[in-house]
Amino acid sequence: MEFKHISVLLEETIDSLNIKEDGVYVDCTLGGGGHSKEILKKLSHKGKLIGIDQDTSAIKAAKEKLKDYENIIYVHNNFYNIDSILEELDIDKVDGIIMDLGVSSYQLDEASRGFSYMKDAPLDMRMNREENFSAYNVVNSYEEEELFKILKNYGEEKFSRKIARFIVEKRTENPIETTGELVEIIRKAIPAKFQREGHPAKRTFQAIRIEVNKELQILNKAIEDSVNRLNKDGRLSIITFHSLEDRIVKVKFKELEKPCTCPPSFPICVCGKEPQIKIITKKPIEPSKEEKEINSRSRSAKLRVCRKI
């Protein structure tokens, strides 16, 4: 299957990086190479781009899309490791970093990946298929209380307790092996009148995917390490697709902009914690009405940008 992914907020993200033609940039989530291609167009032969992705299918697709460009380095890894990746490449500082935290259209559309609740497939949801831990492990081995917390905290699912109980009850008969089986369990757990508000499995699938790929744990550290690797005036641009991610980015940016922990009554700062960034987007940038109509998957996207000081 061809790797397809429509880059969200493409123009806005590229503009936010304030690209210098001889700069060094990092695309932490290479995907199909959409954002990377626009960055490369603006770089001279002295500029450089590092493209990171934990999905080998994404890297293969990007290499084909970007075959005309020589100043890109491909890295099969998780952007959680951005610090060690740049260390290994002997790169100290960079001028801009982008993170697009969405699941690619390819990953959603390829049934075998197990991300989609619309297609029956083995329970998988691994971004990195070289990892052993998958959605199957979460669904079939987690205790009921663990499942409840994941569905509640990562999926913001109001019926998380009931869904967790139904999953545990069902798997005592036989292991739950496919997305179709899981969807049926969720349908039985959620009252019919609440199933009119979008697909009933959406929040549960989101929660399990986040748990499988440790997405929220990765994000905090990745933001801190990225800011540390930016040159002065370098930009960090992050696209999120649900409120949990957006909240983490918003809070972390605020912490880095105003890190002082002194009591408000202190006349001067004595904690020694200095601001590292300036937030550029006081409110997140969202897709235009036109983009939302063209690409329905962009509807929940939000772009937040900061500048290293």
Swiss-Prot record:
GO terms for biological process: rRNA base methylation. InterPro entries: RsmH (IPR002903), SAM-dep_MeTrfase_MraW_recog (IPR023397), SAM-dependent_MTases_sf (IPR029063). It holds the Pfam family Methyltransf_5. GO terms for cellular component: cytoplasm. One of its GO terms (molecular function) is rRNA (cytosine-N4-)-methyltransferase activity. SUPFAM superfamilies: Putative methyltransferase TM0872, insert domain (SSF81799), S-adenosyl-L-methionine-dependent methyltransferases (SSF53335). S-adenosyl-L-methionine binds at G33, G34, H35, D53, F79, D100, Q107. It is found in: Cytoplasm. Its EC number is 2.1.1.199. Keywords: Cytoplasm, Methyltransferase, rRNA processing, S-adenosyl-L-methionine, Transferase. Specifically methylates the N4 position of cytidine in position 1402 (C1402) of 16S rRNA. Belongs to the methyltransferase superfamily. RsmH family. This is Ribosomal RNA small subunit methyltransferase H. It comes from Clostridium botulinum (strain Langeland / NCTC 10281 / Type F).
